[in-house]
Design a protein with these regions (language model features):
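Cytoplasmic-side transmembrane-helix entry/capping segments in multi-pass membrane proteins
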Residues: 62-73, 121-126
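Membrane-interface helix termini and inter-helical loops of multi-pass transporters
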Residues: 27, 144-158
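Membrane-proximal helix-loop-helix units in multi-pass membrane proteins
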Residues: 81-127
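C-terminal ends of transmembrane helices
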Residues: 49-60, 108-116, 178-182
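N-terminal membrane topogenic signal
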Residues: 1-14
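Structural signature of hydrophobic alpha-helical transmembrane segments
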Residues: 31-46, 90-101
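Hydrophobic, membrane-facing alpha-helical anchors
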Residues: 15-24, 37-57
Length: 193
């Protein structure tokens, strides 16, 4: 198996694992913010570990630094979520919004710094803007929660939307890796052409 086929296989596996790590957002009903924190921390940690692996061993090793940095950011965020004491629904959503904004900024920088294959750069730019948009929605939602009369059942709404924000980010990352696998898995394709 040549380098590109092996890299495409790894990228496909990473994409599928990222998609699977988003499943708890759709399956687990958040009973309380504590349970949702644990679920989100697990999802983010799993996604971060997969992104680190994709950056180190995937098809686009030359630009894998971006994936490694995103993975490290995700692992750090998951650690904060898992080991932070009492963090309420508003703080939970604020932390996830900040995480998404940071991911979006890193994706944008990675897309702008890409030297080869404009399609990968474009995919990173699109994903970066998506993370920034979702992060802004999360931050605005956490600020709106300061006015509890606006949202009568805001803790449950915030917790559910926070899990969906994490799932959206993981699915976007999965899409990028699956697309890379499909593109480079064909004979004669390489990141240089």
């Amino acid at each position: 198996m040549d380098r590109w086929t092996r890299g495409a296989t790894i990228s496909l596996a990473c994409g599928m694992l990222l998609a699977l790590s988003s499943a708890p957002a759709f399956i687990v009903p958040p009973a309380d913010p504590g349970t949702a924190k644990g679920v989100a921390a697990g999802m983010i940690f799993a996604g971060g570990a997969v992104e680190i692996a994709a950056g180190l061993f995937g098809i686009h090793r030359e630009r894998g630094r971006t994936d490694v940095v995103l993975g490290l950011l995700s692992v750090a965020t998951a650690s904060i979520l898992a080991f932070a004491g009492a963090i309420g629904a508003m703080g939970f959503l604020f932390l996830l919004g900040a995480w998404l904004l940071a991911r979006g900024a890193i994706e944008l920088m990675g897309g702008l710094a890409a030297e080869t294959l404009a399609a990968v750069a474009a995919a990173r730019l699109i994903r970066g803007w998506m993370d920034i948009l979702v992060g802004l929605v999360a931050l605005i939602g956490s600020l709106a929660a300061a006015f509890p009369l606006l949202l009568l059942s805001w803790p449950g709404t915030i917790v559910r939307s926070a899990l969906l924000f994490v799932a959206a980010s993981l699915l976007a990352s999965a899409g990028l890796h699956i697309w890379l696998a499909a593109w480079f898995g064909r004979p004669g394709r390489s990141p240089r052409g």
